[in-house]
């Protein structure tokens, strides 16, 4: 009965919230990872985007004029992560707040000498446990052609990571996935990446990934969708784990060799 009620509610939301065809085609055309989808995947993504916009409140802040085009483009980027999962993956919270540009937040941190500092720091995105996602449109709208980073994918990867508690780079894995293997692969890659960054070695992956296991997972999720060839070349074992987790293979969509 509960399943039937949920299916009915979804069907009603899809009917009432049908996206404008021209708007949807434009949104698909702006993102390389969306243009690569076949017709069936694109149709499913459209359903998730429609349900996302039905379920979540997208609120403007800082004087931003949040248009329908912007809403759809944010939702599309958020929903590519759950294309082969379910919209329920984003249950438990209700709002996306969008600023025109980067924003300031209060933060307390401890430096390497053990001294505690307090102050305001700049952000282009944040994800709160059981709370909103906060985005800078200047950056959310930049994750398009040729980009290898994507703040929307980054923050929504954190949201998936938070399904089993505070973000720690260890989201709830699907049945059949090996927790020990995930841990071994990600710990090894994270340690290697931190060493690269601290040694001043060049890398195409954002150095911010060295901040913590949670940030490593979120940044590698960006690369997985935006530049799968980079993830394959640098951390193929991580790519394989993300392929299992997201149940997608972006490299195959590009006809790239998979190791």
Spans of model-derived segments:
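Charged, compositionally biased N-terminal leader segments and the immediate start
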Residues: 1-22
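Acidic, metal/ion-handling microdomains and their immediate structural contexts
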Residues: 32-52
């Amino acid at each position: 009965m509960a399943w039937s009620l949920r299916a009915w509610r979804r069907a009603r939301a899809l009917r009432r919230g049908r996206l404008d065809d021209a708007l949807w085609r434009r949104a698909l055309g702006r993102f390389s990872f969306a243009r690569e989808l076949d017709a069936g995947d694109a149709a499913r993504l459209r359903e998730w985007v429609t349900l996302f916009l039905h379920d979540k409140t997208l609120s403007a802040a800082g004087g931003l004029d949040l248009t329908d085009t912007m809403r759809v483009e944010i939702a599309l980027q958020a929903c590519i992560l759950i294309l082969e999962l379910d919209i329920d993956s984003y249950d438990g919270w209700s709002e996306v707040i969008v600023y025109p540009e980067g924003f300031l937040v209060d933060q307390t941190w401890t430096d390497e000498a053990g001294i505690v500092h307090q102050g305001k720091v700049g952000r282009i995105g944040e994800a709160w446990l059981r709370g909103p996602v906060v985005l800078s449109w200047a950056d959310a709208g930049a994750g398009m052609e040729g980009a290898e980073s994507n703040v929307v994918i980054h923050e929504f990867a954190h949201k998936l990571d938070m399904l089993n508690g505070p973000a720690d780079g260890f989201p709830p894995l699907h049945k059949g996935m090996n927790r020990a293997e995930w841990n071994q692969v990600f710990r090894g890659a994270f340690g290697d990446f931190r060493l690269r960054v601290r040694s001043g070695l060049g890398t195409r992956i954002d150095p911010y990934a060295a901040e913590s296991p949670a940030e490593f997972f979120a940044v590698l999720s960006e690369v997985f969708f935006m530049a799968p060839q980079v993830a394959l070349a640098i951390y193929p074992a991580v790519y394989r784990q993300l392929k299992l987790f997201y149940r997608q293979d972006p490299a195959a969509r590009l006809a790239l060799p998979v190791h």
